Amino acid sequence: MQLVTTKDVLKEPPGRQMTNRLRIVAIDGPAGAGKSTIAQALALALDIPYLDTGAMYRMVTYAALRDGIDLQDENAVADVARRMNTVMSADRFFVDEVDVTDIIRGAQVTEAVSIVAALSEVRNELRAAQRAWVKNAGGGVVEGRDIGTVVFPDATLKVFLTASPAIRAQRRVSQSGGDVLAIEEQIRKRDHLDSTRADSPLRESKDSLFIDTTDLSIEKVVQQIASSVADIESSSHE
């Protein structure tokens, strides 16, 4: 299990010196595009660690709600991010020694996380934590919404996944239940918030591998990404 504490992370900016030494695959995309499932499968295929940065924003949201913090108070929420201790593995998440794996995927956190994710101070704290995690882990598959554009712009490979809102809603329903039309509306709202926020909005990097997963299996997508990584690494050794 990987301990991530925003109190003692290395404040090292991203750059070629770090990313060129490490195998980093950045996977970005909107909610429900298959990022988590594909990123986890890819990490297993490549035998490197996996980091879910979306879970980090959810953990901050949970902690802020727990403490009764006004989510519009940027300084207060950022202070929560700095103070909290988190333990993360591939499938379990702990905040201050409490297992929040299921809680952070619940409706309350899901409805509020886009507010927290739009706060620049919070994003700065978590970016530093993400860079430190990857440096300590020796690389990894990192998924989120600004990984290839901001956190690791010089990643080995940058991937942007998407799918139609209807398909993304169906996937969420199959995972967690709920009304498909209501979830599709939530997804569309989240897309708008993510793509229009002032700090690192969701967008495709110019040099990313774009994959529409609407009609593709997980295995097919993982195979395509792994093949691209192999091609890049092979050409770099020629």
Where are these regions (language model features)?
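Hydrophobic anchor at the beta1->P-loop junction of P-loop NTPases
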Residues: 27
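Small-molecule kinase domains that catalyze NTP-dependent phosphoryl transfer to phosphate-bearing small molecules
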Residues: 90-91, 130-138, 147-150, 154, ...
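Conserved lysine of the Walker
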Residues: 35
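N-terminal phosphate/diphosphate-binding loop that engages ATP/GTP or pyrophosphate donors
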Residues: 41-107
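P-loop (Walker A) phosphate-binding loop of NTP-binding proteins
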Residues: 30
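Extreme N-terminal, non-catalytic leader segments
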Residues: 1-24
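ATP-dependent NMP and nucleoside kinases share a basic, alpha-helical "lid"
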Residues: 101-176
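Hydrophobic positions on the alpha1 helix immediately C-terminal to the Walker A/P-loop
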Residues: 38
